[in-house]
């Protein structure tokens, strides 16, 4: 065993006085001194439990002792009588065994592969032990869940990721998916439950037993987000529901996750075999699947973006050449060829590497280097985490922990360890890049083209000197370009740019200037790009991105030239530069029905319990998607209707995620309202009004929302901190508003306006469905019924959605006096015009002035409220374009008039989108859109001016 280094020997002297009673420096073995000096976790544990230290000193941990874990745990749980004592024993057992593993790992008593195996078996033992105890307890309370034939149904648990692969790290969380075989009911209990209810309750208790922090700590952080539909899906699914999901909706990234999926516990029964057989075709295709390569390229981009986004410079998992890249390399071959090559279907990485070598899919030397690098990195990761039982992969900055890791990795000192680490990660990165490929470097022609601009940039040439390269520009533009360059250089002198940053900037600027100054609008484009560059000059990684990826630089120039809004966004949030790397996604926004899934995948990389990171991730996702929508808009690949569709679907995905987060936080604090025990869903709905309700969001639109619940009076929550059920929903809505409006370094998510709720700002933030119906029928003004025309549920369970739709339909199909309605709608419009109309007589406000968008909206709303009692089909849609279509189809409006209003409406909205991209207000010269305005005004007079 390597003797302790000098810094660690000195640190040992500070430990001696903290040793448990009965232990002295002379009574301890060299091994004990080494472990207790290395790991604060082990030291704190044996101080609390001195008998563990005596046990370890008398008999060292063995390589195969994982075989005894199940028996040891069974003994520990023999006297458990309730959930609280179960939680205590699970935590006690986990800590005791983790100390044994830390001891064996620190002293290299067993090899590193065995350590991974022991960590994984420990987690599996605790999961299965807790499940089995709780299953029996739930059966005593509610009966045994059975299928219609009376066959008992088990809870099957899929361990995902490193747990499934038998490669768990020291302080890992665990990713699980719960399933049960067949529908039915419980039998033999005090009350019958549907199987779905039984297994949901069992799953909730199991997560609590493992995950909830107590005075004894926790067992594992449990992450359930890999299940179908993530947090918005059921906690536990039947086999049939799982099969439907993976056949119909399973995504590529879910295939990757399922490669490592493994059933926990004794899993050779008929149900387990059925589940494995069902999942196998989804994961491994029968043919050689080269379609996966593009998805893997996207994954590679995600890795790079995450490293930049989180500043993971010294991260041995996510950094370049880290553990994630080795896993990625192996998965490439598993997913492309695994269906044809059974040897590639292993859940574990090292056996799969052996199969890759045997199949000659990678050179033998590459495989050998990957294996050595993987074991080196995994040992370093585990040692790092075992210091404080902390989930981290970032190398320490303090001398003590650096000395610990150098000693644990058998290096002479920290620089030697860093050198070895750098070599291993460089080998991994080389194979990684060769497998997927990077952008092509600059061609000699591009280098030659940029050379004159090197002088302009580095030598600060005067106007006369630079005339040849700027000859195509007008005199004023040429002077402006040179002034911008000179001002930018002066600005740089005020910034603390290091040598590396200056070097990269000097490499980048000639190429950037060559591209920008070849344009006729060079001065305008450069004026938009230099603020962005000034913002990132101290963040070398972004300069390197633009320097090393010429394609990204070209897209940056094109987008900034086209839109100051995009330039401003990129300057404010430089992490968006990552989106420029892949033109395939930059100009092709996410499919309208895929935003929720993309966001779910994005959020999986963020710890569920880290609220700050969750808030940042939501905002960053929205900004990236907005950039892609705007880029497609500028490129002309999205018409105005589709721009709004994408912006609306994006907003709905954000609402879904925010409600999920708020719900999770509230339930963790208070439990859920007890009436939900008897029904599916959450008894909560979010209704979108205005542009959101009408599928007409713009780039900077706020969200008009109201919140509904269906909680009866006198219902309490079922958590340890009980509160009134209606108070729960009020706090939930307040939490949702907070998550939307909190300003982080990435800004706010959306401005939210909830004043359209019953009684406006004076009313309760969240309303019961019954109270909402009563208000609409007896108290609401006509303008509130107009608003209801453009309202729809954007988040909610089917039961509440149906209730809202019924109320909306009832209100809209109520017979009204035509003259009274006409007068009230017209007077409301006149009030709005007086309040919001354009104050500049020489300008036309596209939205608020006569003949503008609001007039078209009022015409549509008036006609729905006027005629829906005769033509109920008019209530079907909430957007103006389809309402106009319905009016024509139902004989209310002439088809030619409806079509003309639709064209006018989309034309005006298109102009608003483009003004937003130019960061211009929503008004134009009075001479613009005269044809459209005249048409709208004629229609207004026809329908809303009293005859």
Curated annotation (Swiss-Prot):
Cofactor requirements of the protein: Mg(2+)
Alphabetic keyword roster: ATP-binding, Magnesium, Multifunctional enzyme, Nucleotide-binding, Nucleotidyltransferase, Transferase
EC category name: transferase
Annotated spans, Adenylyl transferase: 450-947
GO molecular function: [glutamate-ammonia-ligase] adenylyltransferase activity; [glutamine synthetase]-adenylyl-L-tyrosine phosphorylase activity; ATP binding; magnesium ion binding
Chain positions covered by the region annotation Adenylyl removase: 1-440
GO cellular component annotations of the record: cytosol
Gene3D superfamilies in the record: 1.20.120.1510, Beta Polymerase, domain 2, Glutamine synthase adenylyltransferase GlnE, Nucleotidyltransferases domain 2
Catalytic activity of the protein: [glutamine synthetase]-O(4)-(5'-adenylyl)-L-tyrosine + phosphate = [glutamine synthetase]-L-tyrosine + ADP; [glutamine synthetase]-L-tyrosine + ATP = [glutamine synthetase]-O(4)-(5'-adenylyl)-L-tyrosine + diphosphate
BP-aspect Gene Ontology terms: regulation of glutamine family amino acid metabolic process
EC code: 2.7.7.89, 2.7.7.42
Database matches in InterPro entries: GlnE (IPR023057), GlnE_rpt_dom (IPR005190), NT_sf (IPR043519), PII_UdlTrfase/GS_AdlTrfase (IPR013546)
Superkingdom of this protein's organism: Bacteria
Family, similarity comment: Belongs to the GlnE family.
PANTHER family: BIFUNCTIONAL GLUTAMINE SYNTHETASE ADENYLYLTRANSFERASE_ADENYLYL-REMOVING ENZYME, GLUTAMINE SYNTHETASE ADENYLYLTRANSFERASE
Listed HAMAP family: GlnE
Function: Involved in the regulation of glutamine synthetase GlnA, a key enzyme in the process to assimilate ammonia. When cellular nitrogen levels are high, the C-terminal adenylyl transferase (AT) inactivates GlnA by covalent transfer of an adenylyl group from ATP to specific tyrosine residue of GlnA, thus reducing its activity. Conversely, when nitrogen levels are low, the N-terminal adenylyl removase (AR) activates GlnA by removing the adenylyl group by phosphorolysis, increasing its activity.
Protein name (Swiss-Prot/TrEMBL): Bifunctional glutamine synthetase adenylyltransferase/adenylyl-removing enzyme
Organism: Salmonella enteritidis PT4 (strain P125109)
Organism lineage: Bacteria, Pseudomonadati, Pseudomonadota, Gammaproteobacteria, Enterobacterales
Designated gene of the protein: glnE
């Amino acid at each position: 065993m390597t003797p302790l280094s000098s810094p660690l020997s000195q640190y040992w002297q500070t430990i001696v006085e903290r040793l448990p009673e009965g232990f002295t420096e002379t009574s301890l073995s060299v091994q004990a001194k080494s472990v207790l000096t290395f790991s604060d976790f082990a030291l704190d544990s044996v101080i609390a439990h001195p008998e563990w230290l005596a046990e370890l000193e008398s008999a060292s941990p063995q390589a195969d002792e994982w075989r005894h874990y199940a028996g040891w745990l069974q003994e520990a749980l023999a006297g458990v009588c309730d959930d609280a004592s179960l939680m205590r024993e699970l935590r006690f057992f986990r800590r005791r065994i983790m100390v044994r593993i830390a001891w064996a790992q620190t002293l290299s008593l067993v090899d590193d592969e065995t350590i991974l195996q022991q960590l994984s078996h420990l987690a599996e033992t605790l999961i299965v032990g807790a499940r089995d105890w709780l299953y029996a307890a739930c059966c005593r309370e509610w009966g045994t869940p059975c299928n219609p034939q009376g066959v008992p149904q088990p809870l099957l648990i899929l361990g995902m990721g490193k747990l499934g692969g038998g490669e768990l790290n020291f302080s890992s969380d665990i990713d699980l998916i719960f399933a049960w075989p067949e529908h039915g009911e419980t039998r033999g209990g005090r009350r019958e439950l549907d199987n779905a209810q039984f297994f949901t309750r069992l799953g909730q208790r199991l997560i609590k037993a493992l995950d909830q922090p107590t005075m004894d700590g926790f067992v594992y952080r449990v992450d359930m987000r890999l299940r179908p539909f993530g947090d918005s899906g059921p906690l536990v699914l039947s086999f049939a529901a799982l099969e439907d999901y993976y056949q119909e909706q399973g995504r590529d990234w879910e295939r990757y996750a399922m490669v490592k999926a493994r059933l926990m516990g004794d899993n050779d029964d008929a149900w387990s075999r059925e589940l494995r057989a069902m999942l196998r075709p989804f994961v491994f295709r029968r043919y050689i699947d080269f379609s996966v390569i593009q998805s893997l390229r996207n994954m590679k981009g995600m890795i790079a973006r995450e490293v930049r986004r989180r500043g993971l410079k010294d991260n041995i998992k996510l950094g370049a050449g880290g553990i994630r890249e080795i896993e990625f390399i192996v998965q490439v071959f598993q997913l492309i060829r695994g269906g044809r090559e059974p040897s590639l279907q292993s859940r574990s990485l090292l056996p799969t590497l052996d199969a890759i070598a045997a199949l000659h899919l990678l050179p033998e030397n590459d495989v050998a280097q990957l294996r050595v690098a993987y074991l080196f990195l995994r040992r370093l990761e585990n040692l790092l985490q075992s210091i404080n039982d902390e989930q981290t992969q970032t190398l320490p900055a303090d001398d003590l922990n650096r000395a610990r890791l150098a000693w644990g990795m058998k290096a002479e000192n920290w620089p030697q360890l860093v050198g070895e680490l750098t070599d291993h990660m460089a080998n991994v990165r080389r194979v990684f890049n060769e497998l997927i490929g990077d952008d092509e470097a600059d061609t000699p022609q591009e280098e030659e083209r940029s050379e004159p601009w090197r002088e302009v940039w580095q030598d600060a040439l005067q106007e006369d000197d630079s005339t040849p390269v700027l000859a195509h520009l007008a005199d004023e533009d040429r002077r402006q370009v040179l002034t911008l360059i000179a001002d930018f250089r002066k600005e740089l002198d005020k910034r603390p740019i290091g040598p590396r940053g200056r070097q990269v900037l000097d490499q980048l600027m000639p190429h950037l200037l060559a591209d920008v100054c070849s344009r006729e609008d060079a001065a305008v484009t450069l004026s938009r790009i230099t603020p962005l560059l000034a913002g990132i000059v101290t963040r070398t990684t972004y300069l390197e991105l633009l320097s090393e990826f010429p394609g990204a630089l070209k897209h940056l120039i094109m987008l900034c030239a086209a839109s100051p809004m995009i330039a401003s966004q990129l300057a404010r949030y430089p992490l968006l530069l990552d989106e420029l790397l892949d033109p395939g996604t930059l100009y092709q926004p996410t499919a309208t029905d895929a935003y929720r899934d993309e966001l779910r995948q994005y959020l999986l990389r963020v710890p569920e319990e880290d609220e700050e990171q969750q808030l940042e991730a939501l905002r960053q996702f929205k900004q990236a998607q907005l950039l892609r929508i705007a880029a497609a808009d500028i490129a002309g690949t999205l018409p105005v209707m589709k721009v709004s569709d994408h912006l609306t679907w994006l907003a709905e995905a954000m609402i879904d995620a925010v409600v999920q987060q708020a719900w999770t936080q509230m339930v963790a604090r208070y439990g859920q309202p007890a009436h939900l025990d008897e029904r599916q869903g959450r008894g909560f709905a979010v209704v979108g009004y205005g542009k959101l309700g009408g599928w007409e969001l713009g780039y900077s639109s706020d969200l008009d929302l109201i919140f509904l619940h269906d909680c009866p009076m006198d219902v309490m929550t079922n958590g340890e901190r009980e509160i009134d059920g209606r108070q729960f929903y009020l706090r939930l809505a307040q939490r949702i508003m907070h998550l939307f409006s909190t300003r982080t370094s990435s800004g706010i998510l959306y401005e939210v306006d909830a004043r359209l709720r019953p009684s406006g700002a004076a009313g309760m933030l969240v309303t019961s469905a019954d109270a909402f119906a009563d208000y609409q029928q007896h108290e609401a003004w006509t303008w509130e019924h107009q608003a209801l025309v453009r309202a729809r549920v954007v988040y909610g369970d089917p039961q509440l959605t149906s209730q809202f739709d019924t109320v909306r339909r009832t209100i809209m199909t109520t017979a009204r006096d035509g003259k009274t309605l006409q007068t009230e709608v017209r007077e409301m419009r006149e009030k709005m015009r007086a309040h919001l109309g354009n104050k500049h007589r020489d300008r036309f406000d596209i939205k608020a002035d006569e003949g503008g968008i609001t007039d078209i909206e009022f015409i549509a709303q008036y006609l729905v409220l006027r005629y829906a009692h005769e033509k109920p089909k008019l209530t079907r849609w909430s957007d103006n374009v389809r309402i106009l279509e319905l009016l024509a189809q139902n004989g209310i409006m002439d088809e030619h008039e409806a079509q003309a209003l639709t064209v006018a409406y989309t034309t005006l909205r298109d102009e608003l989108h483009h003004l937003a991209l130019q960061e211009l207000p929503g008004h134009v010269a009075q001479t613009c859109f005269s044809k459209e305005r005249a048409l709208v005004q004629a229609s207004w007079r026809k329908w809303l001016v009293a005859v």
